[in-house]
Amino acid sequence: MKKEKKVTGYDKYINWKVFIFPVLALAVLLLIPTPNGMRDVGTQYQVGPKAVVNHLTRELFEVDSVDAAQWQLLTARIMETNMQMGALKKGRYLARDLKWCKKNKIDADSKNFELAFDFIKNEVDEDRFLSVMNSALDLRKQGLKYEELKGKDKAAADKGAWHIQVAIAVGAFVVLCFLTECIPLPAVAFCIGLLYVFTGVLSREAVAMLYWSDACWFIMGSLMFAAAFVKTGVDKRVCLAMFKKLAVPNTKWITLIFFIIIAPLAAFISDHALAAMFLPIGMLLYQNSLTDEVPEDKELAKLLMITIAMACNIGGPGAPSGGARNVIMMTYLTDMFGIDIGYFQWVTYCFPFVLVMIPITWFITNLRFRPKIISLAPAMDQLRTEIDKMGSWNRQQIWALVIFVIMVFGWFTEKSFYQMGIYPIRLGIGVIAVAGAIAYIITGVVNWRDYQEKVDWGVVWLYAGAIIFGRTLDSTGAAYWLARSVIDFLSQFGMESGLPLLMVSNGLTSVLTNLMADGPAAASVGPIALNMAGMVHPGTTYLPFMAMATAVASSFAYCLIIGTPPNAIVYASGYLEPKDYLRVGIPMFFVANVVLLLFTGIYWSFRG
C-alpha cells in the first residue's frame, strides 16, 4: 500500500477568514496619523547623520562639512559611524582600518585615511576626542527638533517617520501571520519584501541583496550538507558514537545529553553551526525509533528538534564569543561609562546562567512534549545493525566527513584569519557553507536531485524574509522607537530605576529578539537602558549588570521561527509547526526572565 504523503503547512491554502486580521492590522497601522515620537526618531535617523558630520567638522576643523577637505570629511564620517555603534573613545577610532570603512560603506582611500588617522592620533587628545563625541551624541539625541526643521531636512524626517510606521505595521502583520498560520510561511517572507518595496522603505535592489545575505546562505548551505550527511550515512556513525555508552537510552537521557553538549559549546561556537551539525542526528534518532506498533510519534520528533534549538539558544550568553549581542553591550559599557568587562570576567558572571538554564530548559521541554516512544534502545540497536551492514568507511563517507571538517574549520577561523591578513577577503560563514555544499557535488557525494528533494527550500526563503524584517526594524529606527516608547511609558509608574528598570529592559529586549537578530535587539534597548541606569545609579555595579542582563535577555528567542537561525534550521526537518515553538517558548520566556532577575539580585550582587 502506498504511504500517504504527510500534510504540512506547505500544503495548506490561504485562510481568508483569518488572514483578514493581519491585513486589517497592517492597514490600520499604516493609515493612522504618524505619532510625534516617530517623527523625533525619524529626525535622528534621517537628519542626524548629516547634522552630526557637520557638527564634527566644525568642532575639529572649524569649517562646515560642505567646505571640508576630503580627509576631514572622512574623519567626521568615521567618528559618526563609531558614535552610532556606541564607540565613543579615541582608541576605538584608532582601531579602524580601510577594511572596516569598506564594511561600513564609508568611501576611503589610503592617502586620506592616513591623514585622518594621523590627525586624530597626534592632534586630538583622549579627553578632547571624548568631549567632541559626547557633544555630537547629545546633538543627535536631544539637539535636533522636528518642529525646527525646514525644507529638505523636514521632508527627510517625515520620510524617516513613515519608514518607522511601515516597519511597525509590517511587524504586526508578520507576527499575526506566524501565530495564525493563515498563509504558508514562505509566502510571508515574500510579503515582507513586497511590502517594503511598495511602500518605498527599501529599493528592489536592497531587498534582493538582503534576500541573499550571508545568514541566508548559511541556512541554505547547512541544510545542503545535512542532506549529504543523511545520504552517505555519516549521521548514523556520529549518532552511535555519541549515545552508544548510554546504559538506558531513553528520551530524557538523550535530550539531556543534547543540552549538556550543545549549550556550553554555543558560548564559544556559532549556534548556527551547532544546529546544523545536530539536526541530522536528531532526525535519525526519530526515524530509527519508529516501529510497526508506533509508525509515527509526532511528539518525539518535536521533542528532539526543539531540544536542539533551545540548547543552542540558551548557550550564547555564556561568553563574549557566544554572539554579537555580548560584544555590543561590552562596547557600549566601555565607551559610554569607561567600565571594562574582560572575557574571563564575563564568563564568570554569565556562564553560570547557562549551567542553571540547562536543567530548567530540559525539564520544561520534556514537560511540554510527551512522546509515546520513551526508550530509544531499539533505535540504537537498529543503528548498530545498519552500520555493521555498511562495513568500513567508504569513499563517499570519507569525503563527506573531510569536507565537513574543513567547513567547520573555516567557520571557526574565517573572521580571525581575515583580521590577521591570512585571508585577503572576508568570506563569511554563509559562503563557506555553500562552498562546502558545492564541494559535495564536485567530489560525487551528492547530485543536485539530492539537494532538490532533501533541502527545505521554503525555510531558506522564510529566513531570508526574517533577515529583511529584522534589518529594517533596526535600520529605520523602528526598534529604537519601540524600545524608547515602552521605557518612557513605564517610567511614569516608577519603573525607571533598580530591579524594575532591569525587568523592563530585559522583557523588552527578549520581545524584540524574537522579531529580529539578537545584536540589533541589544543595540536598540541597550543605550536607552544604560543611559537611564547611568542617571539613577552612576558609578555603581548596576551599570555592568544592566549591560550583561540586556545581552543575556537578547538570547531569549524561544517563541518564533524567525527569532534565531537554530529555530529556522530545525524547522526544516518538517516535524514542527509554529505553535510548537510557543509550547516551550512562552513558559521559557517567563522562566528565563525570572531566573535572570534572580541571578542579578543574588549571584551578581553577591559577586559585586
Predicted regions and their residues:
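Interfacial loop-to-helix junctions that mark the boundaries of transmembrane helices
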Residues: 8-15, 44-45, 153-163, 178-180, ...
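Structural signature of hydrophobic alpha-helical transmembrane segments
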Residues: 158-168, 187, 213-224, 272-275, ...
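Transmembrane alpha-helix interface/packing and boundary motifs in multi-pass membrane proteins
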Residues: 174-183, 261-271, 309-320, 412-413, ...
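Flexible hinge motifs at transmembrane-helix junctions and intramembrane kinks/re-entrant loops
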Residues: 35-36, 172-190, 207, 272, ...
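Hydrophobic alpha-helical transmembrane segments of multi-pass integral membrane proteins
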Residues: 246-282, 492-536
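Membrane-interface junctions of multi-pass transporters
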Residues: 184, 200-218, 226-240, 244, ...
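Core transmembrane alpha-helical segments of multi-pass membrane transporters/permeases
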Residues: 64, 68-87, 92-95, 99-136, ...
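Juxtamembrane and boundary regions of transmembrane helices in multi-pass small-molecule transporters
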Residues: 2-66, 88, 92-96, 100-135, ...
